[in-house]
Structure formats: structure tokens, C-alpha cells
From Swiss-Prot:
Gene that produces this protein: Naa11
The protein's enzyme class: transferase
Biased composition (Acidic residues): 209-218
UniProt GO cellular component terms: NatA complex; nucleus
Keyword Transcription annotated: no
Keyword Transcription regulation attributed: no
Disulphide bridges: none
Name of the protein in its database record: N-alpha-acetyltransferase 11
Family (UniProt): Belongs to the acetyltransferase family. ARD1 subfamily.
Region (Disordered): 175-218
Amino acid sequence: MNIRNARPDDLMNMQHCNLLCLPENYQMKYYFYHGLSWPQLSYIAEDEDGKIVGYVLAKMEEDPDDVPHGHITSLAVKRSHRRLGLAQKLMDQASRAMIENFGAKYVSLHVRKSNRAALHLYSNTLNFQVSEVEPKYYADGEDAYAMKRDLSQMTDELRRQLVLKKNRYVVLGSEETQGGTLPDAGEACLPKNPTSKDSGSSDSTDVQDSSEDLDSIS
């Protein structure tokens, strides 16, 4: 199983995976909006034959009154590949990319109040916390939990890894690191391109799933 950054030619298969797994679906232009605006943030899981079996579609929010933060638009894993930890791996990879590319401080998502499997995954495994309830968020009138995950712990871990990597190269006498080519810990989290605009879709940031498997969240 391989987790990698999504490419433009993956978007149709990501949409197909979404249609198979979830009741909340999106037009292809919305996938392109994410892929072109934040190409670093969306990831796919592919099997040994290169077929997409899961994905995470993510973006950065653009609120001038808040700290930099990302948002998970959709997360899904096909039923045939659930309970392998793919949802957690996809989520962690997207969160890491938010930190490294845009200096994100937290990541948010929405989930149906009735989706107990998703709530369990987000709360108990991924350390999300409910921030508020949004009444009638979904098209069928169901309320949504707005949830947030603080990324400070992951940021600290990435900094530690960077320091260890730098020290290892210094011990080995690498000419590249002796010349100071590695960034310092803070530089790894500086924003690079946070300038894209929202497409205006109001009901496209839900994260929910119709099954009881933990790895099928979207």
C-alpha cells in the first residue's frame, strides 16, 4: 500500500472513490479547485496495482482574523481496504503538509452528529475536539459537529526530526550540511503560497461516512 501526493490525473478516480463511499458528493471542478490551489495538501492511497483505494481532499482556510489553519474537505477509504489504518495515515500526511507548507496551527473538519464511527476516530485516535455544533449543516437537515485538531504537537515532532537529521549529517561529516543547506526548525513551517481564493461552495466541507468502519470517513 502506498500513500502519495495526489496529482491532477488522480482527480477523476478520487471522485469515483467519493461516489462509491459517501452521500456527500462534489462536481469535478471542486476537485480541480483543491488540486490547483493547494496541490501539496491532498493525498491518495493506492494498492499494489496502482488503483486508488482512498483519498483525503484538503485545503487551507483564509480567515484574516484567525491563525493559519487547514480544513479537511473529504476523507474516504473503499470498503475493501478499511481497517488498515489508511484514514489515519492520509489524515496525518495532509496535516503534516499543512504545517510544512503553510505553517498551519490547527486543522478543522465537519462530521455528522450521527456518525459515531467517525467521531470515535477523530476524537480517540486523531485528537480532534468538538468546537461547536452547526445546526442543519447537511442538505438533509442533520446537524454537524465542527471539530479541530491542534497541530502544535506534530509541529514539535517535525522540528525534532529536523534537528536529529541535521545532527546526523554533521556527525557523518556531510559537506552539504556543513555548508548550512538544511533549514532551521522554524523555516520548515513557514508559509509558501497561501494566496488562493475560495470557490464559494458553502456545503462542500463536510467530513462524514455512512458506514461503521473507522477507515471510511469522509
